[in-house]
A protein has these predicted regions:
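Class II aminoacyl-tRNA synthetase catalytic cores and aaRS-like
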Residues: 1-189
Length: 189
């Protein structure tokens, strides 16, 4: 935080970022894009950095939003040295906004070029390789576990959908939900 403040940057990012698409929408819209093909379609997306690979004058990020993941393709000649240096300082877990043209790399990966940063995370996420293995940490910092582990996030989403469907079904039959500890003056178990 102090390093960002010393550079004259807001450590809490921008107030708003207008995105044009969710990642799943881009996957569907550009599914037929051939390997190595570029488009003139400008898009704006936002999400969390889940992986980063620096290869000389190119940086690849894996960006995740609530709907999916996509690769970001950053070239020093397209961004300039200052912005490229900022991109190198990004950590796992940072929220960024990406604006650029849709393309598919020669290896067939759907990608977007990056030119803006929403916010730098003050505490980076665990590395993807080592992950979050300590059970106690996973339970104490459930928010980190939900960000890092797709399986845990899917379990919570499924649970939420099941409970919601059950509530709707019961409400349609005239039932209402009562949380029983509320009815007692002393909580117990």
């Amino acid at each position: 935080r102090e390093a960002l403040l010393a550079e004259g940057k807001n450590p809490y990012g921008h107030a708003a970022f207008e995105y044009s698409h969710h990642i799943v929408d881009l996957d569907e819209k550009y599914a037929e894009l051939a390997d190595g093909e570029n488009t003139e379609d400008a898009v704006s997306i936002a999400g969390r950095v889940m992986a980063k690979r620096v290869q000389g004058k190119i940086i690849f990020f894996e960006l995740q939003d609530a709907t999916g993941r996509i690769q970001l393709f950053c070239r020093i000649n397209a961004l300039g040295e200052d912005v490229f240096a900022e991109m190198k300082d990004l950590d796992l877990g940072d929220w960024i906004g990406a604006h650029g043209l849709m393309m598919r790399t020669r290896r067939g990966q759907l990608s977007v070029a990056v030119d803006s940063l929403l916010s730098k995370a003050l505490r980076p996420l665990p590395e993807k390789f080592h992950g979050l293995n300590d059970k106690e940490t996973r339970y104490r910092q459930r928010y980190v576990d939900l960000i890092v582990n797709d399986e845990v996030r899917d379990t919570f989403q499924k649970r939420s959908k099941i409970l919601s469907a059950f509530r709707r079904y019961m409400e349609a039959d005239g039932y209402y939900e009562v949380e029983t500890p509320i009815l007692q003056t002393v909580q117990g178990g």
